[in-house]
Regions:
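Short helix-perturbing small/polar motifs within transmembrane alpha-helices
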Residues: 30-33, 110-114, 177-190, 204-208, ...
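Individual transmembrane alpha-helices with interfacial aromatic-anchor signatures
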Residues: 91-96, 165-169, 335-352
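Hydrophobic transmembrane alpha-helices
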Residues: 166-239
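Interfacial aromatic-anchored transmembrane helix boundaries in multi-pass membrane proteins
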Residues: 149, 153-164, 214-230, 253-289, ...
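Hydrophobic core of alpha-helical transmembrane segments in multi-pass integral membrane proteins
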Residues: 25-34, 60-65, 103-111, 136-146, ...
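Membrane-helix interface motif
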Residues: 65-81, 144-157, 320-329
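Generic transmembrane alpha-helix motif of multi-pass integral membrane proteins
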Residues: 231-248, 285
Length: 378
């Protein structure tokens, strides 16, 4: 019976609680072993911590792959489409497939760049130009497909656009543009060069995969999208703090594309941009204070302030999306008040990340390793 359940469209719902408690137990076991190792064999603790990190990363990578497959099976199934009055044919053709192509192109480009960085550095520049062109074309194709989907299924649906609610397209595009300007403008304060090497790309891949897996370990779900997770943004914020804001914003943008593939409720191209690539690019702002001398000996404070700034920028993106795209969810309430209150869950997520980040930076071994990586990327 369990096997049949796993093979059904409801496999995600069967697997999710099992994975949640398995992951909590796995992490708790690693923490317990680390505590024992630290108090009994301090001379080998650094090596243990490094090995534990890669074991956890491998576990979360497998978990992410399983969750991703099951999530697609659930949200793009005939059953889910029928229950939610979705047109499965257009949903797959105009939302899922273009998003999968974009993610494939982006990830392939990053892998190619990483390999060239290590084995053929002279070929990086022409490859980068071509890869950026292909990725831009794939992103434009996604936006065009979402525009077609909006016109066919959302524009006159009687729900998102009705007598009491409308999707404000111009405001959405302006909100997305202003959010990009805000995030890009803040990256100016990061004086480190925007140059990836094989190591920074490897860490980007590992930490993004860890964030993706942890995003499925939900402490609670919001009714119309969004959730408080088991510190899923911690790996991304740590990456930004160690490797710099510019790299963090770029990795967050790419991570946002991966997150968007899971969501069958992409109703407008600008809403997609605000909630996913731009919203998660904002997470990279966590690194704004990492290279500031005032926080050199107090990384806990620098990381905490950076996390609050990043969470606030992400919050703004979600609020704008809620106000201008999802007015229907407010059901007659003041849409600004509704969106501000609804999206406040972001700060609960950030608070958990800050607690975990402070605990990590209170470890001399972790701080030493992080500082070594930070100096190497100045």
């Amino acid at each position: 019976m369990f096997l049949n359940s796993l093979l059904s469209a409801n496999a995600f719902d069967t697997f999710e609680p099992i994975a949640k408690w398995l992951t909590v137990g796995f992490i708790a076991a690693l923490v317990l072993l680390a505590a024992v190792e630290y108090h009994t064999r301090k001379d080998t603790f650094a090596r243990f911590a490094k090995n534990a990190f890669f074991v956890l990363a491998a576990y979360l990578l497998v978990l992410a792959a399983v969750f991703f497959a099951l999530d697609i099976a659930k949200h793009y199934s005939d059953e889910y489409a029928a229950e939610n009055w979705l047109n499965k044919t257009d949903l797959v053709k105009l939302v899922l497939l273009p998003m999968l192509v974009l993610v494939f192109v982006a990830l392939t480009s990053l892998i190619g760049y990483a390999l060239l960085s290590k084995y053929a550095p002279a070929r990086k520049k022409p490859f980068t130009i071509v890869a950026l062109g292909v990725c831009a074309a794939a992103l434009i194709a996604v936006l065009v497909c979402l525009s077609v989907y909006y016109r066919k299924h959302i524009q006159n649906d009687g729900y998102y656009n009705s007598e009491t609610a409308t999707v404000k397209q111009l405001a959405l595009y302006l909100g997305a543009a202003l959010s990009v300007l805000l995030i890009v403008g803040l990256t100016v304060f990061d004086k480190r060069k925007f140059v990836f090497d094989a190591r920074s790309l490897a860490y980007a891949g590992i930490l993004a995969a860890m964030s993706f897996a942890l995003s499925y370990i939900k402490l609670w779900d919001m009714p119309h999208g969004g959730s408080v997770t088991l510190v899923s943004l911690l790996p991304l914020m740590l990456y930004a703090y160690i490797f710099g804001t510019k790299k963090g914003v770029f990795v967050g943008f790419t991570y946002g594309l991966l997150q968007a593939v899971q969501d069958p409720w992409l109703i407008h191209p600008a809403q997609f941009l605000l909630d996913y690539p731009i919203g998660f690019a904002a997470v990279g702002l966590a690194g704004l204070l990492s290279d500031h001398k005032a926080f050199a000996k107090l990384p806990q404070i620098g990381f905490s302030i950076g996390a609050i700034l990043a969470g606030s920028a992400r919050f703004i993106c979600h609020v704008l999306s809620g106000v201008f795209a999802f007015e229907a969810y407010a059901e007659g309430q003041n849409v600004w008040a509704y969106s501000l209150l609804y999206n406040a869950y972001v700060f609960v997520d950030v608070a958990l990340v800050i607690v975990a980040g402070v605990l990590l930076y209170s470890s001399a071994s972790f701080t030493k390793t992080a500082e070594k990586l930070l100096r190497a990327n100045r």
